[in-house]
Every structure is written in C-alpha cells, then in structure tokens.
Amino acid sequence: MADDKPKEGVKTENNDHINLKVAGQDGSVVQFKIKRHTPLNKLMKAYCERQGLSMRQIRFRFDGQPINETDTPAQLEMEDEDTIDVFQQQTGGSY
C-alpha cells in the first residue's frame, strides 16, 4: 500500500528537460537547458553562435564519443549536469 504514494524528492515536473554543460578547451563552460528528445544540433549551433565559432571548426564529444547533429540527450543516455567536451578541428599535420 505504501508504494502507491509518490516518492518525495523525485522530480515529476521538468523531467523532459536536461541541463547540460559544454566545456571548451580554453576552460570555459557554457550551460544549456534542452529537452531530452531535441536533436543536439540545436545546442551545438547555439554554442557556436555564443562563442563566435563555426560548426566546421569544432567537434563535440560526450564520454569520448563523437556526437552527431541528429543525436538527442535521450539517445546518448545523458543525465542532468552531464558535460559535453568541445575540441578544435585539427587540420593538416605535415610541414
């Protein structure tokens, strides 16, 4: 019978949103609030605009894995306050 009551401390509202941190190589951290089923390209574009970067210049990774523009936080099993890492695209390599 006790199981019928909602558990205290469990968020029931805002469960479709997630707070994510985007960490740049320069140590900067930008926070975003995004829906769990929204493609991450929306966050990626917003980050680029805010930082004055081009999507072609940088790569986004979560837990060391590349993020595709069509991926969603739900697909990647992201949790609240998770961090996405941003890396500058490396070009060339020979002199």
UniProtKB/Swiss-Prot annotation:
Polymeric chains can be formed through Lys-11 cross-linking. The keyword Zinc-finger does not apply. The keyword Ubl conjugation applies. This is Small ubiquitin-related modifier 2-B. GO terms for cellular component: nucleus. Ubiquitin-like protein that can be covalently attached to proteins as a monomer or as a lysine-linked polymer. Covalent attachment via an isopeptide bond to its substrates requires prior activation by the E1 complex sae1-sae2 and linkage to the E2 enzyme ube2i, and can be promoted by an E3 ligase such as pias1-4. This post-translational modification on lysine residues of proteins plays a crucial role in a number of cellular processes such as nuclear transport, DNA replication and repair, mitosis and signal transduction. Residues 16-95 form the Ubiquitin-like domain. There is a cross-link at K11 (Glycyl lysine isopeptide (Lys-Gly) (interchain with G-Cter in SUMO)).
